[in-house]
């Protein structure tokens, strides 16, 4: 009797292993530490970096610099916590954000706390990146060929999506590492172009650093929206465990060591991308800067066209980094819950449908700036600023009023404030601009 039972559980284990070897997050575990560096850069340095001077113009110098630097420190701290908690259970790896959530809050509750937020972030980012990709392609076309007949954004988004209908079928994180590396290099390049071209232009003769809005109400709401933009700029946490899952781990060399090395490199790159763009862009253009600094810099045309093309390449990589965990969730549900056979056909259909879905939403709702502030506070703040801290308090139980305890509560309070305040600003921006928005523009 024992033998057959034994074999039944072995069969189950073998089946589980087969599924794990097939799923995108867990299938390949041979990443080097520098993979984690450029995956993290690609995930974190969003096209959001180009809206930082605009955010600065709504925050002003004092609050602006404070919030930028503070966000950088807090998010680095919460990222460190996640890297540490990846192997908090000896001999087991928490490969996905929701697995860590389930370990901290229990099977059911953990899923319900993490998965909806993670999906809002990942699908939200992918939709925003569809819009960004399409808009940047359109901009390149306008710059390179100013006399051509204008092509609607809708078609540019479709052209951008066509790339993803192909590369979404790469099986896992390691197979997109070349794309991700290219994307990380691009984000550095266009950030550098953005601030270097600003410096080259020189400070505007009548530069003005007073708040952009004329009314007090406007100032407050713009401030809140800018908070969302900055919070959104540091949001690589949704994919950090999934990236760490690709790194091999042994008792002598746990995965957190190479992962942390990669994260540090990534954060230095993030600082090199963000701070010069935000501060120099604001210093030079003051409150006349557009919500995408590349629009403010019209000349030299070839350089700005190139920068926009780099944005496109970067966004291709970012889209994939954020789509991979979604593919993983979809495929897990289909194979484990609905007992589909893990096959290429299944993968081909689910991923194509996902790309089509993000494309259609992007085409219907191409308003970029307002959505960022709204989603930023709503889903990014929790997953980036305070969920890791709450999990840390639950799992590590630091001493009350000790350094760790205080730091975590500080992050939680800041994060909760962001969650409440940023969407208010974002929503108002959406409402004000909605009058001029056209669906299917």
Curated annotation (Swiss-Prot):
Tissue specificity is: Expressed in flower buds and to lower levels in leaves and stems. Not detected in roots and siliques. Restricted to the tapetum cell layer.
Q: Does the keyword Coiled coil apply?
A: no
What is known about this protein's pH dependence?
Optimum pH is 4-5.
Subcellular location as annotated: Cell membrane
Q: PANTHER family in the record, alphabetically?
A: OS05G0424000 PROTEIN-RELATED
Question: What's the protein's topology in the membrane?
Answer: Multi-pass membrane protein
What is this protein's record name? Lysine histidine transporter 2
Segments traversing the membrane: 33-53, 59-79, 111-131, 153-173, 176-196, 223-243, 264-284, 301-321, 348-370, 374-396, 407-427
Residues exposed to the Cytoplasmic side: 1-32, 80-110, 174-175, 244-263, 322-347, 397-406
Task: Report any one BP term from Gene Ontology.
Answer: amino acid transport
- Classify the source by domain of life: Eukaryota
Give the Extracellular compartment stretches of this protein: 54-58, 132-152, 197-222, 285-300, 371-373, 428-441
Functional note: Amino acid-proton symporter. Transporter with a broad specificity for neutral and acidic amino acids. Basic amino acids are only marginally transported. Involved in import of amino acids into the tapetum cells for synthesis of compounds important for microspore structure.
Q: How is its activity regulated?
A: Inhibited by diethylstibestrol (DES), 2,4-dinitrophenol (DNP) and carbonlycyanide m-chlorophenylhydrazone (CCCP).
Gene symbol of the encoding locus = LHT2
GO MF term list: symporter activity
- Principal localization? membrane
Q: What's this protein's family per the entry?
A: Belongs to the amino acid/polyamine transporter 2 family. Amino acid/auxin permease (AAAP) (TC 2.A.18.2) subfamily.
């Amino acid at each position: 009797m024992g033998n057959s039972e034994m074999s039944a559980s072995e069969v189950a284990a073998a089946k589980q292993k087969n599924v794990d070897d097939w799923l995108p997050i867990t299938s390949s575990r041979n990443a080097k530490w520098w993979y984690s560096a450029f995956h993290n850069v690609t995930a974190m340095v969003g096209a959001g970096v180009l809206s930082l001077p605009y955010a600065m113009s709504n925050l002003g110098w004092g609050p602006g610099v404070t919030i930028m630097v503070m966000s950088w420190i807090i998010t680095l701290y919460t990222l460190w916590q996640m890297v540490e908690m990846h192997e908090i259970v000896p001999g087991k790896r928490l490969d996905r954000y929701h697995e860590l959530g389930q370990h901290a809050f229990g099977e059911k509750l953990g899923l319900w706390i993490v998965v909806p937020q993670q999906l809002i972030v990942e699908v939200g980012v992918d939709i925003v990146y569809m819009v960004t990709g399409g808009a940047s392609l359109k901009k390149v076309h306008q710059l390179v060929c100013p006399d051509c007949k204008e092509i609607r954004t809708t078609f540019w988004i479709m052209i951008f999506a066509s790339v993803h209908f192909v590369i979404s079928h790469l099986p896992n994180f390691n197979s997109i590492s070349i794309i991700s590396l290219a994307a990380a290099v691009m984000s550095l390049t266009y950030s550098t172009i953005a601030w270097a071209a600003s410096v080259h232009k020189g400070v505007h003769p009548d530069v003005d650093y007073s708040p952009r809005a004329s009314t007090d109400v406007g100032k407050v709401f713009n401030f809140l929206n800018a908070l969302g933009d900055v919070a959104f700029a540091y949001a690589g946490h949704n994919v950090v465990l999934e990236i760490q899952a690709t790194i091999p781990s042994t008792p002598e060399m746990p995965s957190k060591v190479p992962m942390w090395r990669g994260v540090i490199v990534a954060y230095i790159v993030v600082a090199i991308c963000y701070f010069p763009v935000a501060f120099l862009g604001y210093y030079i253009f003051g409150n006349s800067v557009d919500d995408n600094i590349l629009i403010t810099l019209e000349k030299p045309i070839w350089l700005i066209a190139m920068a926009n093309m780099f944005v496109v390449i970067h966004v291709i990589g970012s889209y994939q980094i954020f789509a991979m965990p979604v593919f993983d969730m979809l495929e897990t549900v289909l194979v484990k819950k609905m007992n589909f056979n893990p096959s290429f056909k299944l993968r081909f259909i689910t991923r194509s449908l996902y790309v089509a879905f993000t494309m259609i939403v992007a085409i219907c709702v191409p308003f970029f700036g307002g959505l960022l502030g709204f989603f930023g506070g709503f889903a990014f703040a929790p997953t980036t600023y305070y969920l890791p801290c709450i999990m840390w308090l639950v799992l590590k139980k630091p001493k009350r009023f000790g350094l760790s305890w205080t730091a975590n509560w500080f992050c939680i309070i800041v994060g909760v404030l962001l969650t409440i305040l940023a969407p208010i600003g974002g929503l108002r921006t959406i409402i004000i601009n909605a009058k001029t928005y056209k669906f299917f523009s």
